[in-house]
Curated annotation (Swiss-Prot):
CDD domains: NAD_bind_Shikimate_DH (cd01065). Shikimate binds at T22, L23, S24, T68, N93, D104, Y212. The active site is at K72 (proton acceptor). This is Shikimate dehydrogenase (NADP(+)). It catalyses: shikimate + NADP(+) = 3-dehydroshikimate + NADPH + H(+).
Length: 269
């Protein structure tokens, strides 16, 4: 955070509900200091009523925002425009001057490319059907996954996501759980990493975890146990934040430097 706030200080922040746990202020205020940017990043923890009453005002005064659960879908109707990716995904997690973007989508594409050069022919199982699941599903489909299988407790949400993907020309369906075959990618976008069976993990080629506290979730522990490649939630959180800063400032701090700072501050474990 800035030592001094003045007339020229720009306002950035995170909008969500029940987000006391978030690391976003630490990440972005560290980046602002490192980059020498006169800005401050705050948290707007809003219930549904407060969101409806305040969102228009926040959008007027903030230079840029991040959006998390449960408002990634709803915030779109308050924006002037959205980019191609967030329009197709129907979820926004980054805003710059009333324009919407999806950096979860960008982060998944960036990080998966580092692990597997070609995912063509892979079957992807996504646990969850919210905004993060949508971003992951579109990112993996565009990278070449042959099919997306949605596993979600609320079947209506799963059907909505599958229908959205199919309308965009991808191959999506609903499953009760994973079928153990070759060439599997697994994504957990739910708060509970134990939803993914261990048998599925040990047969997969890559595991993607959105939960970042603790960094080593049960899913990540199982991936390590069987020598499976993985992307942890902290990597996703930091990379999507870096992509947001590229949108806001056309520059950013390196992922590794941010992660090093978070561990040094003992904010992650």
């Amino acid at each position: 955070m800035l030592e001094e706030i003045n007339y020229d200080t720009k306002l950035f922040g995170l909008i969500g509900k029940n987000i006391k746990y978030t690391l976003s202020p630490y990440i972005h205020n560290f980046s602002f200091r490192t980059l020498g940017i006169n800005a401050v990043y705050l948290v707007f923890d809003l219930d549904e009523m407060k969101f409806k009453r305040s969102i228009s005002g926040i959008l007027e005064i903030a230079e840029g925002l991040n959006v998390t659960i449960p408002y990634k879908d709803e915030v779109m109707k308050y924006l002037d425009n959205t980019d191609t990716h967030s329009t197709r995904i129907q979820a926004v997690n980054t805003i710059y001057k009333k324009s919407g973007y999806n950096t979860d989508y960008l982060a998944i594409k960036n990080l998966v490319r580092k692990k597997i050069k070609n995912v063509s022919g892979y079957e992807c199982y996504i646990y969850g059907a919210g905004g993060a699941a949508k971003a992951a599903a579109f990112a993996l489909s565009e990278l070449g996954c042959s099919s997306i299988s949605i596993v979600n407790r609320t079947k209506s949400r799963a059907y909505e996501l599958a229908e959205l993907l199919n309308k965009n020309g991808y191959n999506a369906s609903i499953k009760e759980n994973c079928n153990i075959t070759n060439n599997i990618l697994i994504v957990n976008s739910t708060p509970n990493s134990s939803v993914v069976p261990e048998d599925c993990v040990k047969k997969s080629d890559l595991v993607i975890e959105f939960v970042y506290r603790p960094v080593e979730t049960e899913l990540i522990k199982n991936a390590k146990k069987y020598g499976i490649q993985y992307i942890n939630g902290l990597e996703i959180l930091v990379n999507q934040a870096v992509e947001a800063e590229k949108i806001w400032f056309n520059k950013s701090v390196a992922d590794e430097k941010i992660i090093e700072y978070l561990y040094a501050r003992e904010l992650v474990w």
